[in-house]
């Protein structure tokens, strides 16, 4: 018996991979669990990245049949990974020391990173070192492609995952952003009448993001690819009413040269067309109460009852990313944008709106969410793979202190 790790082939592996996915989704009957439906595409969560790879682990056994020795192969695990270039730090331009009196802003330092996700091992084949083999093989591909750091996200309560990556594979705790989840109600969310919301073109959004957010940790260098992706439903900016009426919008350059006192921005990513989630293990009474709340919300929308959405069958999500803003009323602007995004998700038949922000990011207070559905501390772990660094100003990024904000790539949520 041996384990062979190789690249995923849709033609020969799809059925077996889906079987392993389903077997890994069997949780304790007494507990509520969250399961992912990949809609027939095991690559759906990585295929929009600049470079990606999926590996499968095959268990090869020798069997005897009619006096002949044969090899029997079956897939018992898989892992996914993608590569991109992101911001890992900042520095001042080279001429800053020569002209210290000139007002200059720091510029981003980029590095090539890899993200690991979707590690699955068949329950009957665990504790055989298969997960370590998959991680090691994936890291070989990362290194071959010039990756300097590899990182992943997991739950701090997932002891098996933490033990595998932190104790066996050399990863360490790095960042702990917060995942904020808001149900989509039957009634429309309130959007402040003191706020005007404008939709930007991908090019306009790119200009603002690069000018204002490119020094934020994990900012993707290929932000233009994200904004032009078909899954991106748009970038929206909130300003005080009448400050920048749609008919007077003169473009991002003039906006940035003379911005209003307060403003905020976010983009919406449509996960609904790529994958869906499902809550399993809820009691019959719990499902009944949730259904009753939805009926009441639909019949009496003016009461604005915070109904519990239909999460007990596959449901869609809109992911909000690139949240930010400036000014004393930026939080109010963010709240209005989130209300607008809620109503957009309602139009698209989604049950949940989610985002992920820095744990101590001030913007967090402006994002409506249910604590019971959210995760205050999503654990990100990192490992240094390359000896050569993109810039000497950074040093060893794994030992750096976190900033207030973090840019979460929607392609990896």
What kind of region is each of these model predictions?
Residues 14-22, 26-54, 111, 166-319:
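Amide-forming acyltransferase catalytic core, primarily the GNAT-like/NAT-type
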Residues 85-95, 104-116, 309-320:
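A conserved beta-turn-beta hairpin within the catalytic core of GNAT-like acetyltransferases
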Residues 57, 81, 121, 266-268:
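GNAT/GCN5-related N-acetyltransferase fold signature
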Residues 342, 348-413:
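C-terminal functional modules
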